[in-house]
Structures are given as C-alpha cells and as structure tokens.
C-alpha cells in the first residue's frame, strides 16, 4: 500500500460520518435490489381445483341488432365476409392466429314492422325493423334480408346455436298500432285479444326461417327488458314494458304455439334490463320485481312457468348498470348466484354494452378501439362467469357506430368495418371455451384484484383445458399456473393487448411460470 495514501481518518470527516454517508446507503441499495429480485421471481401461483367443477358453459354470443340488416345489403361483399369471419370463424391463419372469435350463439332480432311504417313509426330510422307478417295476414319471407344473410353466414361458419328475440309484438297487434310504447304506461303494448296471435306469429316465423333458411332456433325470448323504465318512455326504438302476469300469460300461449308447430325451441324468461330486477324491486313496481321467485316459485300461482314443457329452468338477464362500483359488481352477482341456487335455476347473461354510468372508461359515447374498453368488459365477463355462475354470456350489438355498443365499428357510407380490441377480448373467451365446457374453481394465496390479475379455468368436452388470465394493471405480473392433482400440462398462449397485431396472437408455449404483459388478456390452451 502506498504510504502516502489517504485513509478515511485523514479525510475532513469522521469515520462514522463517512460510513453513514457512503457505506450504509450502498448496503440498503443492494438490500433493495436483492429484495426486488426475490419479489419478481416469486410468481403468484394460481391452482386449478380439478375436484371443484362449477357451471357448464353453453355459449358466447352477440346480436344482429340493428346494423346487420343494412350491412347485409352492402354491395361490398368482401367486407361482409370479413365481418362474418371476425364474428363466427373458428379457423386459424397460416401463422396459427385465429381469424375470428368463434361466437357460438347468434341472437336474431325478429322484427315488428316499424320499418314499413317509416316516419309514422316514431322510431329512429336506424333502429326500425321489418316484419315477416303483412297487413293481410300472409307472410313475406323476403323481409329482413340483411339479417337473414348473416344468419346463413353464421351457419356456414359453424355457429351451433341461434336465439330469436323480440322488442315488440307486430304493429298489427299492439294497442297503439306502433312498435314503441310512446309513454303509454308500464303494461304490455299488446291488445288483450292478440296474445294467441302474437304467439302464433313467433312460432310461424321460426318455422318459416327453418324451412326457408335452414336455421333452427334453439331459443326464443318473447319479451326484451320488460322491466326497463325506458321501455315506457318512448319513442326511440322498438320496445314494450310488461308485467310479470302478462309475461307469464304470453309464455303459456307461446308454449302452445311452438308445440303446434312441432318446434322444440325453448322459451327464455325474461331478458330483464337489470339483474337487480331479478332479486327485488328496482326502479319499477312490484308487478315487475323479484323475477326469479315470480316465475319459478310454485307458490306464485299466477305467474309460475316452471311447469311449461318448453321453458327451461333458467333466467336470462342483462348486466347493464351493475358494473360500478367494482366491489358492488361482485356483491350483486354473488347475491344472484345464491338466489338462483335457492330456486334451482341457472343464469344466462344475454346482453351488455357500455352505458353512461360506466365512468371508469368515460361512459358509452364515442367508440374506443383500445384495451381500455376491452379490459373493462373482460372484467365484467369474468365477474359474470365466476361470481354469478353465468352459463351463457352475450354482448349486445355485433356491429355499431360511434358508440361503445358494437364489437366492430362500421362505417355505413364507406361500406367498411374496423375491428377492435373489444372484439378480440371477447374472443379470448368465446374462441377457446366451447359449448359444453365446464368451469372449475381457481384458487390463489392472494385475494383477487379487479385492478390486477383475474383468472378463470375451463375444461372443454374434448378434455382439453383452457385458462383465461386478465392483467388489468399497468405493470407486468408474474404468473404461475398449476393443477391441484399435480399433473403437468403444456399450454399454447394467445394474447390480446394494445401491441399492434396482438389480437389473439399466439405468443409462445407455457410450461412453468411466465410474466403476463401489462394491460393484456392471455388465454392458455392445453396442447
């Protein structure tokens, strides 16, 4: 050592001061580094509990209202084919990337005739519908041609299930001669002597579509959002309120009409506008509240429909208005699950889009192509499936304009369409979780974070497993997936994120643990 070297005690500061200023900070720096490394390497373990099956998943879907009627009439057939592929295809391209989201149920809006009335319908042009039934009582099977084209395109691409729903009875049968309620009150807009006529119209229409288009309808919803207070404010779009007694009466007539036509179509009750209307009285009165007990308790003698041969023991409703605050979203779905269990019925979520109270993403106005809306909706899907035990899940409109109600943004004048991250986010579920899959419980040592990781798992009928992991956070998250039976599985990962091209993109093979990208949805498919 050079004898002229300056030792610490020759510095103008003391040894203790030098140590506190220079050595201790370095010690804490390295301690922080090692702690961070240890934290990063310690991935959260999510365990699929193979002995804890939950509900059977029937399908994922969307509806043809209202855009498919006009899109189906475009001259640009290539664009129609592209849209149909995005919605219905289960094929992959040469790189193994899905061409579409593989919807497994398609909701067809059976029209009431407001389009034929034109301006006198008091309904916005874009939400009017044609009717197969004509004034003279005959049927015109050339009506609703755009919608029928997409029925065929869906079937050609292998969609296995079809559902018909109505917002109004045909205008010939309504009390005001319109397909909208025009503020007339909270009772059904249907003449008292036309219940059987309305039922025959529905059955005849489904029979005709089967004969002319080769489409069999598995399900029929005679009413739509009958408890929605908007339904008796009108006019804006087709719609009618109804009391539970009126709905039960219509269900009985519809049951007879379907049987007479030799159809095994099932009648769904009752497409409530808000799941809170299933549990109690919400923004309405007793005649439209407590839908579950009203329709499925034998003690409800005037409204019980559980004894009808073509009414399955399930309730269909819409998840609007119940997605914020986030803790409440979970709570109300758990309440719904317990109420369904009490009466021995299942739950289907048949319609949802972004509404004005979805403040976290700025409400429904203005289309959003990004993961902001996609992640928000994925969180709703996760809650509906894992807390409400929904057996079926459907988005509202397949295609729409400058509002957050369409999976695909369409430009009518240009006759073209643009996909969105929302479309592919639904595909993280619909493309890989096929009809008949069973959801299994997933456990973790950490409490689920609706702003972080949300994980659910499913086993398809072919025995292959599927796991969907949502990373809602702005940071990558370490992730480890295992099974309670300790068996090893190899997974192909498909990711949707804001990264260009990551629309169900295959991003590698998973065997142990990995890091989930920030603001992404990853689907793990067993190889």
Predicted regions and their residues:
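Aromatic/acidic polysaccharide-binding cleft in carbohydrate-active enzymes
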Residues: 346-431, 440-446
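Carbohydrate-binding surface patches
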Residues: 446-489, 519
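C-terminal beta-strand-rich structural cap/linker in extracellular carbohydrate-active enzymes
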Residues: 506-527
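Structural recognition of the beta-strand scaffold that forms the well-ordered cores
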Residues: 58-64, 104-110, 161-165, 218-222, ...
């Amino acid at each position: 050592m050079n004898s002229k070297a300056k030792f610490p005690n020759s510095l103008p500061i003391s040894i203790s001061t030098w140590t506190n200023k220079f050595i201790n900070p370095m010690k804490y720096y390295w301690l922080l580094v090692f702690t961070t490394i240890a934290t990063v390497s310690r991935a959260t373990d999510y365990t699929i509990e193979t002995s804890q099956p939950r509900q059977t998943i029937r399908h994922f879907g969307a509806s043809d209202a209202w855009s498919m009627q006009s899109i189906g009439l475009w001259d640009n057939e290539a664009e129609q084919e592209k849209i149909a592929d995005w919605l219905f295809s289960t094929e992959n391209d040469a790189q193994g990337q899905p061409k579409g989201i593989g919807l497994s149920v398609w909701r067809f809006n059976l029209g009431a005739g407001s389009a034929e009335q034109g301006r006198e319908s008091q309904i916005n042009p874009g939400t009017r519908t044609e009717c197969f039934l004509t004034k003279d009582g005959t049927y015109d099977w050339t009506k609703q041609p755009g919608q029928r084209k997409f029925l065929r395109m869906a079937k050609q691409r292998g969609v296995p299930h079809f559902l018909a729903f109505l917002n109004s009875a045909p205008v010939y049968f309504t009390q005001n001669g319109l397909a909208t309620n025009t503020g007339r009150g909270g009772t059904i807009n249907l003449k008292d002597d036309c219940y059987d006529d309305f039922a025959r119209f529905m059955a005849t229409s489904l029979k005709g579509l089967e004969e002319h288009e080769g489409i069999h309808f598995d399900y029929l919803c005679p009413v739509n959002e009958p408890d929605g207070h908007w339904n008796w404010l009108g006019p804006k779009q087709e719609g009618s309120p109804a009391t539970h007694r009126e709905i039960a009466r219509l269900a009985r007539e519809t049951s007879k009409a379907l049987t007479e036509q030799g159809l095994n179509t099932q009648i769904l009750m009752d497409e409530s506008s808000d799941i809170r209307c299933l549990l109690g009285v919400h923004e309405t009165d007793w005649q439209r509240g407590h839908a579950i007990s009203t329709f499925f308790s034998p003690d409800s003698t005037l409204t019980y429909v559980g004894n009808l041969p073509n009414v399955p023991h399930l309730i269909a409703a819409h998840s609007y208005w119940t997605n914020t605050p986030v803790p409440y979203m979970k709570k109300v779905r758990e309440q719904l699950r317990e109420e369904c269990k009490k009466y021995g019925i299942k739950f289907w979520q048949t319609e949802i889009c972004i509404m004005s109270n979805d403040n976290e993403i700025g409400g429904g106005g203005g289309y959003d192509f990004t993961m902001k809306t996609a992640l928000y909706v994925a969180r709703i899907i996760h809650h509906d499936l894992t807390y409400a035990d929904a057996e079926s899940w459907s988005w509202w409109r397949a295609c729409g304009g400058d509002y957050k109600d369409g999976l695909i943004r369409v430009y009518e004048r240009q006759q073209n369409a643009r996909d969105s991250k929302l479309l592919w986010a639904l595909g993280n579920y619909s493309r890989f979780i096929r009809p008949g899959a069973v959801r299994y419980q997933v456990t973790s040592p950490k409490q689920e974070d609706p702003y972080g990781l949300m994980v659910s798992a499913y086993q398809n009928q072919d025995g292959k497993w599927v796991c969907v992991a949502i990373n809602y956070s702005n940071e990558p998250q370490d992730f480890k997936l295992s099974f309670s039976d300790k068996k090893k599985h190899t997974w192909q990962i498909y990711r949707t994120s804001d990264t260009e091209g990551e629309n169900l993109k295959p991003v590698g093979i998973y065997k142990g643990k990995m890091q989930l990208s920030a603001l992404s949805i990853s689907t793990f498919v067993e190889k």
